[in-house]
């Protein structure tokens, strides 16, 4: 009887634990693109239709399941404002069920160098896709052209246009290099750790010019390269070239990530200024960054978007009937005066989120010109929140304060669920480490609790953007969108993107600001705005 009673008690305890966790969350992001259904990964073929003022996003897509698998297609979405996206029919399909239309890029062939177009097609809509055809036997570079502005495509009859007798040769990114009047392609010899650079007159015949190889973090393989001219923040008329390389697996924090190199390009060779591998985004969920072929100049010349997930756990993310979202589109510039530490300035990629919201609520300012103490924490009511909101926090550390290294001297923000405040995000800054931290593990979603690769806690080093009157100032902008968080520190000098998951319907209901020490933190500004 004792054994029977014990087993009954144990079963009841297990049932209680199971009931306290949920398997899925159906809260879809509002301002981050997600497919209606199915699986999505890398962004592809980004371009701007100048005739119709329309932005095009293509992406790796499996409409038949919520995990990666073949056949793999190019999904398609369009936008008028880079924030609100409309799903379109599949754009490019593979020829076999065991194959895939893998990642690639789009160009606008204004001058009809390919010969695919006649005068009935507006030069601004002469788009050609350059993509990898993947089969179990090989990876080869194909091209397809569109006669209707990027909605349907015809495959070039003489494909492939580039082959290397390899199963690891992919992700062509093509742009027009004006000085030489040639098309330039970067493509990854993934497991040779090479980014090969090719040139072409017509998009059909390609000449190998050089290779950028064995640089930075190697990981298991290189993927999704890109080469783009990026203007400097200090003087937009001046620019440098940036080489982007994705790594998967083998990222320093686990799984996948993006790195970049700053240098020069002469039409055939890219040369990095130094041997530093720089990190594009310090979060766990930002991969396969691709930049737009062309842009609306009012937004800037260097725009990009990334897949907001990580290959370590992307197949297990608890959303349904879709998996994965894209990051916000970001405007990139180069800060040539980035203060890496008090003695060194570096060239650093700066990111600014592009967010066009017509129905956002007003900014509500909750703290201004205030010294934070343990007794005067701030509580912000978000009971009408949809689960998507922005916040801005400008704070300073009193450098005259002496704090023991054994004290966790933090400023913390607690974003709590409305229906269940035991689910929350905690983020903030700790003085001794000079780092901003995030804890995304306080959830009752089973995936968050049980998946060992979904790192609950992470941090990123922060340096002050200014110091005056014994105060060192820091700035952070954050966007929380149902299950994805983007953080921009000091106007985008450092960025961190991470997903998080709470029980379905448990929208953010409050924000609390606390500290563990008195009179250390000065709050210059803290404000919140709901996105509806």
Swiss-Prot record:
Annotated substrate binding sites: 39-42, 60, 102-103, 170-171, 223, 311
PROSITE patterns named among the record's database cross-references: GLYCOSYL_HYDROL_F32 (PS00609)
Gene Ontology terms: biological process: fructan catabolic process; inulin catabolic process; raffinose catabolic process; sucrose catabolic process
Keyword Glycoprotein attached: yes
PTM section of the record: Isoform Secreted is glycosylated. Isoform Intracellular is not glycosylated.
Name of a matching Pfam family: Glyco_hydro_32C
Cleaved signal peptide residues: 1-19
Keyword field: Cytoplasm, Glycoprotein, Glycosidase, Hydrolase, Secreted, Signal
Coiled-coil intervals: none
Positions glycosylated per UniProt: 23, 64, 97, 111, 118, 165, 266, 275, 356, 369, 384, 398, 512
Keyword Secreted: yes
Active site, UniProt feature: 42
Family: Belongs to the glycosyl hydrolase 32 family.
Additional note from the record: Present with 1780 molecules/cell in log phase SD medium.
Name the record gives this protein: Invertase 2
Native source organism of the sequence: Saccharomyces cerevisiae (strain ATCC 204508 / S288c) (Baker's yeast)
Gene from which the chain derives: SUC2
